[in-house]
Amino acid sequence: EEINGNNYIDPTQLPYDHKWEFPRNRLSFGKTLGAGAFGKVVEATAYGLIKSDAAMTVAVKMLKPSAHLTEREALMSELKVLSYLGNHMNIVNLLGACTVGGPTLVITEYCCYGDLLNFLRRKRDSFICSKQEDHAEVALYKNLLQSKESSCNDSTNEYMDMKPGVSYVVPTKADKRRSARIGSYIERDVTPAIMEDGELALDLEDLLSFSYQVAKGMAFLASKNCIHRDLAARNILLTHGRITKICDFGLARDIKNDSNYVVKGNARLPVKWMAPESIFNCVYTFESDVWSYGIFLWELFSLGSSPYPGMPVDSKFYKMIKEGFRMLSPEHAPAEMYDIMKTCWDADPLKRPTFKQIVQLIEKQKNKNE
């Protein structure tokens, strides 16, 4: 992972492989999932994307008429990066694109539970503080839910439509271990239940799983010499089986009205997630992504609180960061997870762990928690 800065990929230099082309007349558009000043992401049905006669729910990123050349280039760059990266369970994978005969459309996996930040906030009231003595109760709770299962859905390659009143049980530990070995979550393991997923509780095991999955996704990006630059809970999507997927909705994010993006020079930047070297020297590296991952962990274990609560981004904030101010442990973080956060926030970028090392550290914590 320690790669010379000159080797980071330059999206503008990547080729676009036309094998991804998909006929735009086979897309049927639905509701808007996210929108910004220049772009939006829309839910759509793609006909014949995987199998010749099958319909599949997808997410389609596109530009608005207000977009400029810069935004058009940015969308094309994102398409090239996704094409270059290839598939990984913990990134939002490319499924196709429309680049001829009309505006550019980027077709990706649809993640039915939306972004992780809002998911965490919705689950706050039902969070189960799974201290050791609570584990039996949590296991019983999950087993009771799973005993209410009805018939299995046999679709292994396509998304299942999420209709009101039908939902899917969180996988058991055995399911999760099995899916990790396989390398992707097999949907026949996810069974419809009487209780909707929205009513299923969140526990420490889930938070550790999200931490682990995002670290795996980031290790994959690093192995491909790719820097994310905007890692945060709002940029992680969640799908069936509580699988997390890293995305970048840059064009579809309303950064003008999102207080997380602070005007700095000519740009709006997510300052509270940025490493000091990124804030003060505009340097972005794997190590600065690791800093952002530490902030993401803080969001995760605070169940979606905003970092540096009550602190506006002003000259005092910049001074405190320069002087080494760091956040205290969030409410639900085990001591070992807070230790990881603190190492991610080392002032010396080279003393921060790599994502590969973070994966190993969280693996130990997950095993201990089981």
Swiss-Prot record:
The keyword Nucleus does not apply. ATP binds at L33, G34, A35, G36, A37, F38, G39, K40, V41, K61. The keyword Nucleotide-binding applies. SUPFAM superfamilies: Protein kinase-like (PK-like). Transmembrane segments: none annotated. Keywords: ATP-binding, Kinase, Nucleotide-binding, Oncogene, Phosphoprotein, Transferase, Tyrosine-protein kinase. Its EC number is 2.7.10.1. It catalyses: L-tyrosyl-[protein] + ATP = O-phospho-L-tyrosyl-[protein] + ADP + H(+). The active site is at D230 (proton acceptor). GO terms for biological process: Kit signaling pathway; positive regulation of cell migration; positive regulation of receptor signaling pathway via JAK-STAT. The modification Phosphotyrosine is found at Y261. Residues 27-370 form the Protein kinase domain. GO terms for cellular component: plasma membrane; receptor complex. Lacks the transmembrane and extracellular domains. This protein is synthesized as a Gag-Kit-Pol polyprotein. Belongs to the protein kinase superfamily. Tyr protein kinase family. CSF-1/PDGF receptor subfamily. This is Tyrosine-protein kinase transforming protein kit.
